[in-house]
């Protein structure tokens, strides 16, 4: 009798995705982040579900309900901080996952890459709406500032903003709909992640050399299942270290002040994982220009496969390309730092410079280094 794992309609899908999947034998720990993102998503959905049981999406009780979760619900503080810091872990894994894709040329798997970009946008939207829910000062003013950006759209902008708000300012209706969307989006992310995997398994994984690995594949289980379990344990250790010892280190103290539409916080800034994009937004004096730059800072990832002109797929054997890549990482770190600083000299100027360099590296320097390396190798 044939193995049930290989014949049963449902088990067969699972088998071909996680057990008998032919995998390149040389994929490094940089390939662990896909499974870590899956783990993060599961943690976020589980903790979020339990938080939603006790949370009330109403302006008069939202802040109190979060305090109630932390004080009165059994292990509520643990669930709340796991959810808040889980989001940070999610974005750390996301950025490393995208960085890996850029370094090793995984963007050549077009469908997988484009769905990945869609996943990134959806996750950013989910995180933004989740940040509004505790209804602290930074929640309220963050929601006001970011939703207001849509008013930059010519002619219909103001109507769109008021439509999203459900009134003439961020209020009860806004909080309620943000809770609704924040609840539904993770399930949409799960569906997109499945499609992401579906397309990846059509072509098979890339590998650190950037060369074809058709001649050297090994089964996913047990080799990579055990490797992913190790990665997952390390992730949970790091998350619990944050949750149990430094739960508020990545948050903003202003969010422990209940939302007050009459008092503006001295510095309105998003969570750390949005600071690079926020710095790019602020570095352009024009509102519409800033919004376009903000969207393009992520959407530029979709252009990268079209401007890839190297004869090699990966940066493994391209030292000049590596310099460009690590310059980009340094530039993103600079943007993240600038995003958290007040808008004054010299931060404003550094931000504008770093924003310009960001787009220049991706659109000019990286293709230029590729051409130079092709020439040096007489290709």
Curated annotation (Swiss-Prot):
InterPro entries: Cyt_b/b6_C, Cyt_b/b6_C_sf, Cyt_b/b6_N, Cytb/b6-like_sf, Cytochrome_b, Cytochrome_b_C_euk/bac, Cytochrome_b_N_euk/bac, Di-haem_cyt_TM. One of its GO terms (molecular function) is metal ion binding. GO terms for biological process: mitochondrial electron transport, ubiquinol to cytochrome c. The keyword Mitochondrion applies. Its cofactor is heme b. The keyword Acetylation does not apply. Binds 2 heme b groups non-covalently. It is found in: Mitochondrion inner membrane. SUPFAM superfamilies: a domain/subunit of cytochrome bc1 complex (Ubiquinol-cytochrome c reductase), Transmembrane di-heme cytochromes. The chain crosses the membrane at residues 33-53, 77-98, 113-133, 178-198, 226-246, 288-308, 320-340, 347-367. One of its GO terms (cellular component) is mitochondrial inner membrane. It is a multi-pass membrane protein. Heme b b562 binds at residues 83, 182. Heme 1 (or BL or b562) is low-potential and absorbs at about 562 nm, and heme 2 (or BH or b566) is high-potential and absorbs at about 566 nm. This is Cytochrome b. It comes from Idiurus macrotis.
């Amino acid at each position: 009798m044939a193995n049930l794992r290989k014949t049963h309609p449902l088990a067969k899908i699972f088998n071909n995705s996680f057990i008998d999947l032919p995998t390149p034998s040389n994929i490094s720990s940089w390939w662990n982040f896909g499974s870590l993102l899956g783990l993060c998503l599961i943690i976020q959905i589980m903790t979020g579900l339990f938080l939603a049981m006790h949370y009330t999406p109403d302006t008069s009780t939202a802040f109190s309900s979060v305090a109630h979760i932390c004080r009165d619900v059994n292990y509520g503080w643990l669930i709340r901080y796991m959810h808040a810091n889980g989001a940070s872990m999610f974005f750390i894994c996301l950025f490393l996952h995208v960085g890996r894709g850029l370094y090793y040329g995984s963007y050549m798997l077009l469908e997988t890459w484009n769905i990945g970009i869609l996943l990134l946008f959806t996750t950013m939207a989910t995180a933004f709406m989740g940040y509004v829910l505790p209804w602290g000062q930074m929640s309220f003013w963050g929601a006001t500032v970011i939703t207001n950006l849509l008013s930059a759209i010519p002619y219909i902008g103001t109507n769109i903003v008021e439509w999203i708000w459900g009134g003439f300012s961020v209020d009860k209706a806004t909080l309620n709909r943000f809770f609704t969307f924040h609840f539904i989006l993770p399930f949409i992310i799960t569906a997109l992640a499945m499609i992401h995997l579906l397309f990846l398994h059509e072509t098979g994984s890339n590998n650190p050399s950037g060369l074809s690995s058709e001649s050297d594949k090994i089964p996913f289980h047990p080799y990579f299942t055990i490797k992913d379990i190790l990665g997952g344990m390390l992730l949970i250790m790091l998350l619990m270290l944050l949750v149990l010892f430094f739960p508020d280190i990545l948050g903003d103290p202003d969010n422990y002040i209940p939302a007050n539409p009459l008092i503006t916080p001295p510095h309105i800034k998003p969570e750390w994982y949005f600071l690079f994009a926020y710095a790019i937004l602020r570095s352009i004096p024009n509102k519409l220009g800033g919004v376009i730059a903000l969207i393009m800072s992520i959407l530029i990832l979709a252009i990268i496969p079209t401007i890839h002109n190297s004869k090699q797929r990966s940066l493994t054997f391209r030292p000049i390309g590596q310099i460009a890549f690590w310059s980009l990482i340094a530039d993103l770190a600079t943007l993240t730092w600038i995003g958290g600083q007040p808008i004054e000299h010299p931060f404003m100027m550094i931000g504008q410079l770093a924003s310009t360099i960001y787009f220049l590296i991706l659109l000019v320097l990286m293709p230029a280094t590729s051409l130079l390396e092709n020439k040096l190798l007489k290709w």
